[in-house]
Design a protein with these regions (language model features):
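Conserved NTP-handling cores and scaffolds of large molecular machines
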Residues: 9, 37-44, 55, 62, ...
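Hydrophobic "anchor" residues on beta-strands that sit immediately upstream
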Residues: 11, 196-197
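Long, non-coiled-coil amphipathic alpha-helical linker/lever segments
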Residues: 33, 40-92
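A short helix-turn-beta junction within AAA+ P-loop NTPase domains corresponding to the substrate/partner-engaging
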Residues: 240-252
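Hydrophobic/aromatic beta-strand patches that form the interior of the parallel beta-sheet core
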Residues: 12, 227, 248-250
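Walker B catalytic acidic pair
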Residues: 200-202
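Conserved NTPase motor "head" modules and their coupling/switch loops across ABC/AAA+ ATPases, GTPases
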Residues: 67-196, 205, 209-227, 234-243
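Extended, charged alpha-helical "arm/stalk" segments used for dimerization and assembly
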Residues: 1-60
Length: 252
């Protein structure tokens, strides 16, 4: 199975598409959380796969005009079992991850701004069992499950304001790069492996100071093999000349 191979060769990719984590819907942010935890926690990945399978079955049951409540209870029990495990591990992950993220953002931005991340989950205020019971009538009307960890989300803040609305392109990009560098460090700590780091055309829309600080960050023994792509050969060479390491340039 493909899931059996996740985590054996850890890889962290930083690319312009990462802005979707800030700008797109909650599913992209959940995918980010899952992509980190699954690298080192096989039980989490198994619970996540099982949860999504049961969720799909429960939603199919809700779409039927007539169904056996016994089946619904079976699905509820399974959702609660897997969902609670996922919730606890996501909450613990955010508590451990945010300080690492903050460290990288403060370095890249020279501590010019403050950031924070807020984990949003239905399970923060109510038990999953109570939520399913409370929302059963709504679920039957809408014919899908309205509560659970499949609705989890993250809010990103810059100086107490939503990053999506108040952050410049440079600030948003600095935040995303910080998230991926924090992901690298977090996975390395958990797996004791050095992931490969791919920097795919990430220096656009960043001022020289922030570019230099990113280069300084990755130019130490905390990082292993690094691949950097850029559309401009001269800019690429200027960036690499600041790295006190051997490098090879490939032109395509």
């Amino acid at each position: 199975k493909l899931s059996d191979h996740i985590g054996y060769y850890p890889l962290v990719l930083i690319s312009p598409l990462d802005s979707e984590i800030i700008l797109s819907g909650s599913s992209v942010r959940r995918k980010f959380i899952d992509s980190v935890i699954s690298q080192f926690d096989k039980q989490y990945l198994s619970d996540l796969i099982s949860y999504n399978k049961v969720l799909k079955q429960r939603n199919l049951l809700l779409k039927q005009s007539v169904y056996d409540d016994t089946h619904l209870k079976v699905y509820n029990d399974e959702l609660v079992k897997y969902g609670n495990n996922i919730f606890v591990k996501r909450k613990d992950f955010i508590n451990e991850f945010v300080p690492v993220l903050t460290k990288y953002y403060n370095y890249i931005s020279s501590s010019k701004e403050t950031i924070n991340v807020n984990y949003k989950s239905d399970l923060l205020n109510f038990s999953f069992n109570d939520l399913l019971a409370k929302n059963l009538h709504k679920d039957k009307i809408l014919k899908y499950t309205c509560s659970g960890v499949h609705r989890d989300d993250l809010d990103f803040f810059l100086n107490t304001m939503k990053l999506k609305k108040s952050g410049s392109q440079g600030q948003q990009k600095s935040f995303m790069i910080s998230m991926k560098l924090a992901k690298y460090e977090y996975i390395k700590q958990k797996t004791k492996l050095y992931p490969s780091l791919l920097l795919d055309d990430i220096f656009d829309k960043l001022d020289n100071e922030r570019c230099s600080r990113i280069i300084e960050l990755v130019n130490n023994e905390n990082f292993g093999q690094i691949f950097i792509t850029h559309t401009c050969h001269d800019t690429m060479k200027d960036i690499l000349n600041r790295i006190n390491s051997d490098y090879i340039i490939f032109n395509f």
